[in-house]
């Protein structure tokens, strides 16, 4: 029956439930948002609280009052309810049902089985093809109304007997408020059509039950397996009954009998019931009883017939109802609504080109697509054209494992760093690209690894698959059916997610671009589940594992499932909470429906048990969070700690060697006297030196000091020892006397006649181009023995937090002046194309500290002018600031 109700308000016509469902299924956050996310619930028509009258509207615009319809009435069951007086048509329906029952008992063996199977398929075809054809013609041309009128059902003059019979039949089925003569012809035609539907639906149901009974068998399995099989079957039957009953409670007879093909209903919408549990519940979970009966009968033929009938029902939805919805209500609103980013500083909001999604929108001229095609062909050929040996199987499983691990690690790591620090976007901005360029590169990488993880998994399953020798006995047929079902569920889930989220959500756009408003709209599949990909997103892997029946494929499926859960738990969920905060939904449709059903059934859970479950759940979450935090902390600190360990080890070895030298030189240094050495930084009143400014150092030493003495510049803290320098100066040193170290004598500005004092100037390459605390060290002869040290001083660089171009240009000019001595600060169009690589590196290093932005040194030379570089900085800061603004805006509203 129809999976529709009505969309309604006080001035617009109502649409079917299936219509509402379709029109609301638009728009992967961003997973909640993979911006991933949407929700509306299905609807029911509710009578006005002040008046029981419901209004209908015909296609011609006529408004009429509908007869009273008791909410608990099940009109279709009145046909076989012996407590309800029977009309002539009821007797016809009951007679056809009894004829099938009689046919069941007068036949036996294979004749009965195939006869009942034929009866069932006859009525199923009558439903999906017969009723489908009638509704198709009614939707396009109002043909059902024309045919009924043309046959004389409502023609009192020319067909008085048929008229009176129709009148009595319809009035017997309706409330006393029903007025046959004054009701619109569309409404009366709908009532006549309902009688034909009753015949088909009741006979379809009864013929299925008889067919299942005819094929009943007792498979060879242990007693416990029989208990599980039959118990699960009855549970599915009970669940199916509840779905049908609750669906009728929600949609009533109007949508049950496809009323919106004949007229529209006006009313108020309420979103509840089974329509929050699953998409198209009347056509999806509404047929769970088929599979329950298949389990009870233990017959593969019943299962096969059930699958065919269920697929036919989906075809009815696809070719009859959905086109009617699109034609009647339009399909524009059913398209996925893109979450557009904030203004990206005069950049186009979204690229005009169509992104490759799996292999859709494939472009042979796009390098990333060509790479995807070549890798795909290579991985397929590698499996198909190799012998079916253990080595070839290991190779197939190995490449599937590698691609799964690569996809999961890259997926999780990149998104995690992007969510927290915008590392991916910053990387591309540092190379002169935009935020859209960063997102575009991510989309190509994500689609490549995603496709390869699926392709290699399929090929591994193919390599490990063995064609069954017997489909009837054992679990071969069942495994294949269940596996294909899982694969179909996976495909449906993925398509639904993409339809709901669009390109922006599918490719995690809210990780890379700021959305217009951090608010979630739950539609489509997301109105039933918060994270459908959590389990259904890996269903195909389990399906292929069942079909292949290989432990290695089961392992790969488990790996895929665990990695998906891990990314959702440790990457997507924290990101969603960071962006959307209180906007996240507490309960999904499924959870809400189950809770409501539990409350209605007066099922209470002991308080102690609730508290125990809550404690266990919170403990598990705490352990998971702590484990994730520890792993993340290890990954963040492992690199620096290893570098620090190597540095300390090297320094220790050097220190031990230099101690030996110190012992040898100790008598000589004592003879010279450390107190006779002095080192002073010129003009150091506040111990601060501007970034890039030359530093003059005054020194004095005994008259008999070594001519090979030298002065080095070091970061404070790099050398724990005050007597021996343990780290390299990396070229930042100066001789104290000329003609000794020819390459480091240019910095000498003054040398006293006695050569016991002087001034050296550290500038250009001799400086540190990083803010921080530094000191000078005077060393004896050609070694690292420290004779004296200067006072520590700080190299300072002012930060600029503004995003305004003029402010940035003002802050940038002194930096350029420091990095390029002799430039004209007033010339904002100063050319930068001819500067050296070292000078460009200094500039980008200064920009990193002053503006908190990282650029590649080539960007400076590409921009060519200070003004252009300032605009690039302003643009980059605005892009990155837009993320912070969207986060802070959500926090303020939370």
Curated annotation (Swiss-Prot):
It comes from the Eukaryota. Its EC number is 2.1.1.17. The keyword Transmembrane helix applies. It is an enzyme of class 2 (transferase). It is a multi-pass membrane protein. Pathway: Phospholipid metabolism; phosphatidylcholine biosynthesis. It holds the Pfam family PEMT. Signal peptide: none annotated. One of its GO terms (molecular function) is phosphatidylethanolamine N-methyltransferase activity. The keyword DNA-binding does not apply. It catalyses: a 1,2-diacyl-sn-glycero-3-phosphoethanolamine + S-adenosyl-L-methionine = a 1,2-diacyl-sn-glycero-3-phospho-N-methylethanolamine + S-adenosyl-L-homocysteine + H(+). GO terms for cellular component: cortical endoplasmic reticulum; endoplasmic reticulum membrane; perinuclear endoplasmic reticulum. InterPro entries: Phopholipid_MeTrfase (IPR007318), Phosphatid-EA_MeTrfase_fun (IPR016219). Residues 1-90, 135-195, 244-268, 321-366, 416-447, 492-538 are lumenal. GO terms for biological process: methylation; phosphatidylcholine biosynthetic process. The chain crosses the membrane at residues 91-111, 114-134, 196-216, 223-243, 269-289, 300-320, 367-387, 395-415, 448-468, 471-491, 539-559. Residues 112-113, 217-222, 290-299, 388-394, 469-470, 560-894 are cytoplasmic. Belongs to the class VI-like SAM-binding methyltransferase superfamily. CHO2 family. Catalyzes the first step of the methylation pathway of phosphatidylcholine biosynthesis, the SAM-dependent methylation of phosphatidylethanolamine (PE) to phosphatidylmonomethylethanolamine (PMME). This is Phosphatidylethanolamine N-methyltransferase.
